[in-house]
Amino acid sequence: FNEWGVSNKTDQYMFKIYAGQLSIIRRSEIPLSNEVLVRNGLDPSTTLSVNINGTSYNTVQPKIQSGDPYDVDEDPNSPDFGSNKKYWTIEIPRDKFNGDPLNGNGPSGYTIRPEKVTMWKIEFGWYGAIGARFYAYIPVGAGEARWIVVHTLVIENSLYGPCLRDSYFRFKYSVNVQDTSNIRTPQYVYKY
C-alpha cells in the first residue's frame, strides 16, 4: 500500500491506496466520538467491522499501530513505551467520501487515476477545532486542472480534548510492498 499526507507525534492525516482503492486515514491519540463517526459516514451501529490493510477489526475505530517501524511511543508513562505507537485509527473509503468520490459520478465527473493526479492537499485547523479537508488536483482539459474537495472530516468542537497538539506537521509518505513476487519494475515516490 501507499500512504502520503501529514504527520506529527500525536496525529496523522493521510491519503492511502491499498489494493487499488483510494481512502483517507485519520490517526490520533484522541478518538472520535460516535456522534462524529456518524457524521462522517462511519456509524458504529451499522458498521460492525472494518478492514484496514488486510486485517479485520470489530470496531470502526481500532487503536492500532501505524505500520511505521520508526513511530515509537516515547511517553515513559505509557504502557506501550518503547514499542510501536498505537493510534485511534479511522479509514474512510472512497464510497464514504462526502465530497467528490472521484468515481465518475461526483460533481467533477472524474474517475480517479492516481498516476494522473499531480497534487493532493490537506487543510486542517490546529487543535482540531475545524476538522480537515482533503483535496485532489485533477485534470479538467488540455493543460488545465483544478482543486476539488474529496472529503471533509467534520469534527468541529466535538472532541473531549485537543488533538493536533503540535502545529508543525511533516510531510510523510510510505510505499509498503509486502509481496514483491509480481513486481517487474522499480517503484518510486516523487515529492516536490
Q: Where do the model's predicted regions map?
A:
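Secretory/extracellular carbohydrate-interaction modules
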Residues: 1-69, 75-77
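Short, surface-exposed beta-strand/loop "edge" segments at domain boundaries and coil↔beta transitions
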Residues: 7-13, 30-39, 142-145, 176-189
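A recognition module on extended beta-rich or small alphabeta surfaces enriched in W/G with H and D/E
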Residues: 50, 57-60, 72, 166-178
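Short helix-loop boundary/capping segments
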Residues: 59, 63, 67-101
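Beta-strand-rich interaction surfaces with strong enrichment in secreted/lumenal proteins
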Residues: 107-111
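Localized edge beta-strand/strand-to-loop motifs within extracellular or lumenal beta-rich domains
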Residues: 115-131, 137-139
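Short, solvent-exposed beta-strand-to-loop segments that form ligand-recognition rims
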Residues: 139-167
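Ligand-recognition surfaces built from glycine- and aromatic
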Residues: 156-192
